[in-house]
Amino acid sequence: MQTSAIPNLSNSTLPKLPSGVKIPNYNRSNLTAGIVHIGLGNFHRAHQSWYLHRLMQQGKAHDWAIIGAGVKEFDKAQRLKLLAQDFLTTLVELSPVGRTVEVVGSMIDYVPIEANNGPLIAQMAKPEIKIVTLTVTEGGYYIDPVSKSFDSSHPDIVYDATHPEAPKTAFGAMVAALRLRRDSGVGP
């Protein structure tokens, strides 16, 4: 028995997916950004991204699309993978009665990753961005393991404090974006 190959995921291949796969019922080209999300791991894609997708399926929240972002070198590979599939992701839900497969279309872009986080700062400073969210691993919070408090002496945090125009961390990039928003008269 020969099975047909499933095409690579992209806007143009959505109609070619197997009939049991749920696909966006909205025109993704009409979506506009409202959220920048830093840290596009599985948790984000199966929760926040899916939640917005479900609203978009109902004809709502089309001005709340997500622009993905990262601040680490390894985020570059993820950006390229998502770019190749038009920022579409797939959510597979398993239950005792079976599984569902749904293509999630709420992400429309992914900020290029640069050492100084300039593109991320510029994107977060845009007036149409209403929310910046993030999901990071435990190490990304810069908590001192002994004191359980924020580690202001961590080298990345010290760097951000002394180089506010070119921060290394997500937190430093958010501070820089807030400064840009303030200086240009855009609300926080």
Enumerate the predicted regions with their spans:
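Non-transmembrane, aqueous-exposed alpha-helical and coiled segments at domain scale
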Residues: M1-P188
